[in-house]
Design a protein with these regions (language model features):
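Polysaccharide-binding surfaces and accessory modules of carbohydrate-active proteins
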Residues: 5, 10-13, 31-261, 277-279, ...
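Conserved, mostly hydrophobic/aromatic
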Residues: 18, 162, 286, 332, ...
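Short Pro-Gly-centered flexible turn/kink motifs
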Residues: 97-106, 281-300, 719-726
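Aromatic-lined carbohydrate-binding/catalytic grooves of carbohydrate-active enzymes
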Residues: 323-460, 473
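Glycine-rich, aromatic-flanked loop segments that form ligand/cofactor-binding clefts
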Residues: 70-73, 78-110, 116, 242-255, ...
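Carbohydrate-binding surface patches
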Residues: 231, 642-685
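C-terminal beta-strand-rich structural cap/linker in extracellular carbohydrate-active enzymes
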Residues: 700-730
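Active-site neighborhood of glycoside hydrolase catalytic domains
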Residues: 390-392, 424-426, 430-587, 599, ...
């Protein structure tokens, strides 16, 4: 069994195939963290709770409450009672006093996993996952706290979430609720996070823990370009293949915090959840509040094992789309080809040329609705602009279908332009503070998705367009963050609920969309990758990775993203050069190889690109058809990092049964008088013999991984090559 409880020792035990997680109860009913790490096979003990140690004096510990709580490895710490480290739960009573102390009441172990109401969350059958629900309670507040742990044994993952139930008569204010805490002794941990900006999202950052608190967070109403809801603690010297890694990833698309605190006793408390800044929730008598989920994994074989655990987990237990295990169509998006300057004839010209190159879908981006010829108007007015889309949307879609392409369309449903019919009719639908001039970003406001009538309007606006024509793909965009937090719908006490209610509104809209249109391929986007998070994956199998499509910039963006997300989730396109973001010119072949490590598509005007580039597209589309299953389903191995060596990049994708391995090598910069470069590959069966496709060269898997492989023959910068190794069957 993945979950066990030792009644005599009062120890909970959670086992995955490679890890064990232990919790124990004190005589007073406090739930403490004992261990998380390599799989244990013998009986567990609770001595790591240090229940008899005095934290301040060398005398016998009299269990003085304040000193005990400030050093005890609390499984779910609460605020206001003497634990002065970061708490996970702060509750204020009706009299305005803040304090909460929870004790164990009971627990339940069952096969399967319950859905989280209104939230994206992992799922699994009764054979795939086992869940432990621990019921704790503050008897004074009459507040129940349900700590849920779901063990996905095969994927080496434990998920955690928290639910609050107000069983009393008074109204409570939740001022902070985090979803997970990991309280451990320090092992000279370093903190690994993902940081960035618009057009350079999710770059890897790593550094030693210092005393005090270190965190990543967002207060923008989205997971953001700048920080990512992911934290890993790693031991010094951790590489792709060795070292301890503790990963925590938040399944949420709004404000978050991930924080590690190194304290006076050299213990580390790592917490993750909804950011407490500008958060508050009124919990009335009889009401419940469900916090989002955190996905945890432990690896003792470096970052590579963590990566593959997350990849398998998200593929098997987070993404619901029918496209999860099916080939995605090769699309061409007209944004960088035309921006707002297009009409029916131009789109059909692109479609005809795209079809001749082997492309399978045309996506019409921003500018098809209202009077939208720039970004200064019409968001919210989701009516087709027949001056541009001559003959109407159905005519355009039908004509594209006749050419032999499928059709997709762009929306930004959460936004409203001040210069729009919708805003003139309903200014109160925009998030803003009455009497204060609201801040515009990209000349737009954000709709108040806490209002049911707004949700209904937005949904029907999108759904009616999809019902009107044969549209099989939607790109759902969000191009600004939230500010001026005010809702004319919510009362004064509820204003701090707006950030979270907004995110719940987004989830409700996308849930309705994928329910009515189950065959729809939905791709989320937010100014590129500002809302690339597990919450969005629950609704869309792919997310636009970044607005930066430059092949070299994408190396670090896709390296960081692929550390936790499957390659099939990363929207990646071949675009024109000079690149529209950085002005760099790279070979068309390299752009294709980098985009192959994602969803693979095109973002250019295929009617205008150089003929030598256009001639390469049919070969690139054949390349995608050949390798799409391997890229989508295979095991990912990071071989070398351009971020670290500043010269080259390399990764490998191995079939689950090791029958084939695809290696991508990107030669970023040349150096004079250089030998061939030896790279140590991964992902092979050490006992098998492989042939390098296109040659007669044969290698054992053991040689490729231990002795290495020589790459050579590169002249000039920004070049790349694929190496396809196939297992010899005789």
């Amino acid at each position: 069994m993945a979950v066990q409880f030792n009644e005599d020792k009062k120890i909970f035990r959670l086992d995955t195939k490679k890890s064990t997680y232990l919790m124990g109860l004190t005589p007073e009913g406090y739930l403490g963290h004992i261990y998380y790490g390599d799989r244990l096979y013998k009986a567990a003990e609770n001595y790591m709770l240090r229940m008899e140690e005095p934290p301040y004096t060398p005398s016998v510990n009299k269990r003085e409450k304040s000193s005990f709580l400030d050093s005890f490895p609390m499984e779910y710490p609460t605020g206001g009672i003497g634990d002065y480290r970061e708490s996970c739960l702060n509750v204020r009573n009706e009299a305005g006093q803040m304090g909460c102390e929870i004790h164990y009441v009971s627990h339940e172990i069952y096969n399967g996993k319950k859905a989280l109401k209104g939230l994206p969350a992992s799922f699994g059958t009764e054979e795939e996952v086992q869940t432990l629900d621990i019921l704790c309670e503050d008897e004074i507040l009459r507040l129940q706290v349900v700590l849920s742990y779901s063990v996905f044994e095969k994927e080496n993952v434990i998920t955690r979430s928290v639910k609050l139930i107000n069983k009393g008569d008074q109204k409570l204010k939740i001022e902070k609720i985090y979803s997970a805490c990991l309280d451990m002794d320090n092992e000279n941990f370093e903190m690994l996070t993902l940081h960035g900006s618009w057009a350079r999202e999710r770059h890897i950052q790593q550094g030693p823990l210092r005393y005090g608190k270190q965190m990543v967070s967002s207060t923008k109403g989205e997971s953001s370009h700048q920080e990512h809801p992911f934290v890993a603690l790693v031991t010094p010297g951790t590489t792709q293949q060795q070292g301890k890694v503790y990963g925590m990833h938040f399944v949420y698309s709004g404000n978050f915090i991930g924080q590690a605190e190194l304290n006076q006793f050299d213990s580390v408390r790592t917490v993750m959840g909804i950011n407490k800044e500008e958060f508050g929730w009124i919990l009335k008598a009889g009401e419940e509040f469900q916090a989002p989920e955190v996905v945890m994994t432990y690896s003792h074989e470096g970052l590579g094992e963590m990566t593959r655990s997350y990849h398998d987990f998200y593929r098997n237990h987070m993404i619901r789309s029918k496209y999860l295990h099916n080939k995605r169509p090769i699309l061409i998006n007209n944004w960088e080809a035309t921006y707002f300057d297009f009409n029916t004839d131009k789109l059909l010209d692109i479609a005809r040329e795209a079809k001749s190159c082997g492309i399978e879908m045309l996506v019409m981006d921003d500018g098809w609705f209202g009077v939208r010829n720039s970004d200064n108007c019409s968001l919210g007015d989701w009516k087709v602009n027949t001056d541009k889309i001559i003959g109407g949307l159905k005519y355009l879609v039908d004509e594209v279908n006749k050419i032999g392409l499928e059709f997709g369309i762009w929306f930004e449903p959460e936004m409203i332009s001040p210069n729009s019919d919708l805003y003139r009719a309903h200014p109160e639908w925009a998030i803003q503070i009455p009497g204060r001039e609201a801040t515009q970003s990209r000349q737009q406001y954000v709709l108040d998705l806490s209002r049911s009538e707004v949700l209904d309007y937005v949904y029907e606006s999108v759904a009616s367009i999809l019902r009107s024509a044969n549209i099989v793909y939607v790109k759902w965009d969000m191009n600004r963050q939230l500010s001026d937090l005010g809702s004319t719908y919510l009362g004064a006490e509820e204003q701090q609920e707006l950030f979270h209610r907004y995110v719940l509104g987004v989830y409700a809209l996308q849930e309705r969309l994928v329910t009515e249109f189950p065959d729809l391929l939905l791709e989320n986007c937010s100014g590129g990758g500002a809302r690339f998070d597990p919450g969005m994956l629950y609704y869309s199998p792919q997310i636009w990775c970044s607005d930066d499509t430059d092949a070299i910039e994408r190396l670090m963006i896709q390296e960081g993203t692929s550390m936790i997300y499957p390659l099939s989730t990363m929207g990646a396109h071949v675009s024109d050069c000079p690149n529209h973001t950085v002005g760099r010119v790279t070979p068309f072949e390299t752009r294709g190889h980098v985009a192959l490590a994602g969803t693979f598509g095109y973002e250019l005007d295929v009617t205008k690109i150089p003929e030598e580039d256009r001639k390469m597209i049919p070969e690139q589309t054949k390349m995608y058809h050949k390798y799409h299953e391997l890229v989508r389903e295979g095991d990912y191995y990071r071989i070398a990092s351009y971020r670290e060596n500043h010269l080259y990049d390399c990764w490998a994708i191995a079939a689950k049964d090791k029958r084939e391995v695809l290696v991508t090598y990107v030669h970023v910069f040349s150096t004079p008088n250089a030998h061939s470069r030896r790279i140590f590959l991964q992902g092979f069966d050490p006992e098998a013999v492989y042939v390098l496709e296109g040659t007669e060269e044969k290698y054992t898997g053991e040689m490729l991984m231990k002795c290495g492989f020589l790459v050579k023959g590169f002249w000039g910068d920004f070049k790349s090559k694929l190496y396809h190794f196939v297992k010899v069957t005789e």
